[in-house]
């Protein structure tokens, strides 16, 4: 019934897994390289772990809240697309490890297709957990409680280690504006403002439209050069144009990358080979 909200805690699957399989599909088809595939996996993890909201908003909650926040300004948010892409990768590796390389997330999708779509019915989180449990002969309820319904940081070292990879982290300085925006209404419309961030200190509000930065077009602004600097924002708010000074913060961004463990065991190499098969 699309005349009303259809709240679901599973958009991290429906949308996020699509992101993951977009990357998997282009890699398996030979369009992208192994290095690009591994970089995408690491970047998804970095995209989540460098986001303040991940401490407070679970993938299930971000899925449900899309009905409140997609086109309505919200104070705080995180992408269930990226959350789901990251979790899909971790589930794929976990399933491969728990089945000694004989099954993967592909098999979960086949089961969802055959047991649900072809029979004209949807699926719940419990259905999905049941399918994974049946395939792996393991109980994945704890995984879901911690990482889907909860906000715990996944054990990346252990899970990427299933495929004989080490997750490397390297700090990088990046500008911290303290807001998220969308290009619309003739500028960048602020969709969320992080508590205690640079945007909040500048008295910016959700719904404000930034039209100029330092007198120039917002679409041509060199955002990457603003760390630690004071800039002047021209903002449209409630039909009025105002100017606000803003001191742009600087924060440490942890860049992630995957490197092969030269001491990988035969089991790890088997999982790796299956994961990277084209």
What are the functions of these language-model segments?
Residues 1-23, 28-29:
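Catalytic cores of extracellular degradative/oxidative enzymes
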Residues 22-23, 31-278:
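C-terminal recognition in membrane/secretory proteostasis and scaffolding
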